[in-house]
Amino acid sequence: MLDCWALLGSPGDLAVVNVFAGTPVPGRLTRWDRVTGAVDSSVRTRERATEDAEALAQVGRGAVNLPLLDAEYRAPGPSPSLRDIDQALTANVPATSRVYAPAGLGNNTDHELVRWYARVLARRGIPVSLYADLPYCVVHGWPHWVDGSEPDSHRDVDAFWRTFLLDVPELEELRNARTERLDDERAAAKLAAMRTYRTQFSSLDGGTAGILSNAAIHRFEVMWDLDATAPPDRERKRR
């Protein structure tokens, strides 16, 4: 929703999958849920699922919610394996012609796991696109080549993004991206849908910082198509 509004609003079949949508045992309260004012994480996950359904309904979509636990809910237990993700996903979505996954441009363990799984699929011949994941990717704003701003010699967003892509050789050229600029009408509709996440939005928005509510942020969406022919272990410089 935050990252793929243009895609969600496009025609054609599209399966939206929330990979880590499992509900933890009652009586637990994690850090993020505490920040967002929850009193019980199991209750909060159900509230988030309801909000997600409402938001997706605005573009005529629904979601498949897999039972895997979010990183905060499974700690201190282990992360699921790629086999665990594959089994949960194929049981609910048995076939696909293309996969869209987060680029992992921030310290989000779950996004990195899904990206890893998507990279494996790319190596097996399934077309894969990675998307810049808000709000993590805009800690330093958008790169000038995304939003058309003047280059700033003291703000190199490319350098920030590259630190999270060192193990993604399939994404060879950072600026070889598809950038979507939503017009005012679509940007306003996206913001309205994001606000549907009532329990999450104000914290994700950074309060008065207004990170996500800033049209200069939420109107842009960035994607990369992975090159599955890239040698997986080579060392190279991204330009």
Please place each PLM-identified region on the residue numbering.
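The feature marks non-catalytic terminal segments
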Residues: T50-L66, A75-P80, P94, R124-R239
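Active-site beta-strand->loop->alpha-helix modules in alpha/beta enzyme cores, enriched
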Residues: M1-R124, A188
